[in-house]
């Protein structure tokens, strides 16, 4: 399978073509959280939109901001969510703010599967369902892409061997290929369990 190449500088340029990404990344340091990152669909979806000739904001369902706080109480996370609403509210797009130290506490209730506690935001990014979607940009502009960016540019969707919930992968890949038909799955896809 041929792959295109994508440098970190070009990735950042493409991501910032989405004005909501640009605004969130500009303001993210002001959220004043540890390990703050803009992650997931806001990033890879923007790249895929640009590569397929769609507007950069097309088909972006929400903008995920991850951070880390050893205080795993709901109240502490809710306080950060409220600060984020004040900081980003004028953008009028759904922004999901989640403390990655808490994921193991709610994951089973949402997805019906247990997962072990994470040790950092980047460990959470490293475990996304599909390897090329394991991307994040820190509050200081550093790109985190443990599998590189070339398969993201090429639209190659591979199940992530580091993910603890592989049964959700088939539904996620089906969703991506429905929204961006030029993408292609590669590697074994496990189970047809539906995402919530």
Residue ranges with predicted function:
Residues 1-196:
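Catalytic cores of the polymerase beta-like nucleotidyltransferase superfamily
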């Amino acid at each position: 399978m041929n792959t295109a190449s994508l440098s970190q500088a070009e990735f950042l340029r493409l991501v910032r073509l989405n004005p909501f990404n640009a605004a969130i990344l500009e303001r993210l340091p002001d959220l004043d959280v540890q390990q703050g990152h803009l992650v997931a669909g806001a990033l890879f979806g923007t790249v895929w939109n640009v590569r397929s000739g769609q507007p950069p904001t097309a088909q972006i369902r929400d903008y995920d901001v991850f951070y880390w706080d050893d205080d795993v109480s709901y109240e502490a996370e809710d306080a950060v969510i409220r600060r984020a609403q004040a900081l980003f509210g004028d953008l009028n797009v759904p922004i999901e703010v989640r403390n990655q130290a808490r994921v193991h506490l709610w994951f089973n209730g949402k997805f019906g599967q247990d997962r072990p506690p994470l040790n950092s935001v980047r460990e959470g990014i490293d475990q996304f369902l599909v390897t090329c979607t394991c991307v994040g940009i820190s509050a200081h502009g550093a790109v985190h892409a443990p599998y590189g960016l070339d398969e993201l540019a090429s639209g190659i969707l591979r199940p992530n061997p580091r993910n603890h919930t592989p049964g959700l992968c088939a539904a996620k890949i089906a969703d991506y290929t429905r929204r961006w038909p030029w993408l292609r799955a590669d590697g074994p896809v496990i189970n047809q369990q539906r995402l919530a």
